[in-house]
């Protein structure tokens, strides 16, 4: 399984906080749930366009919007500190940029966990053909 994890990270392009975000998702669902979202719908994974396909995809859309609002740093490369307290993800970073990125990831992980029942395997590796509609505004 460790080899699969390493291969997946190489395929999608490892970024600074990707591992942290993956661990947050796994904390709100079952282990290795992150893999379900590597390429899901129109927004989960690299980039995004069109209309989110379901509530899970909308979580990724909102996450992308959150990253777009983080100014003065690169949210995909920022590493931050967080912990789990009584089942909750707690961002512990005081740096403005790092805290904002941590909060984006925390909210998205919670959202994906709350909407896991909307997950549709048919949206995994969805062709961009189905995401051609005009993108919503953040």
Curated annotation (Swiss-Prot):
InterPro entries for the chain: PLipase_A2, PLipase_A2_Asp_AS, PLipase_A2_dom, PLipase_A2_dom_sf, PLipase_A2_His_AS
Pfam families noted in UniProt: Phospholip_A2_1
Note on how the cofactor is bound: Binds 1 Ca(2+) ion.
Residues of the signal peptide: 1-16
Tissues expressing this chain: Expressed by the venom gland.
Coiled coil feature spans: none
CDD domains from the UniProt entry: PLA2c
Keywords: Disulfide bond, Hydrolase, Lipid degradation, Lipid metabolism, Metal-binding, Secreted, Signal, Toxin
Record: active site: 63, 105
GO molecular function: calcium ion binding; calcium-dependent phospholipase A2 activity; phospholipid binding; toxin activity
GO terms under biological process: arachidonate secretion; lipid catabolic process; negative regulation of T cell proliferation; phospholipid metabolic process
Binding site for Ca(2+): 43, 45, 47, 64
Cofactor: Ca(2+)
Protein family (similarity comment): Belongs to the phospholipase A2 family. Group II subfamily. D49 sub-subfamily.
Protein name per its UniProtKB record: Basic phospholipase A2 Drk-b1
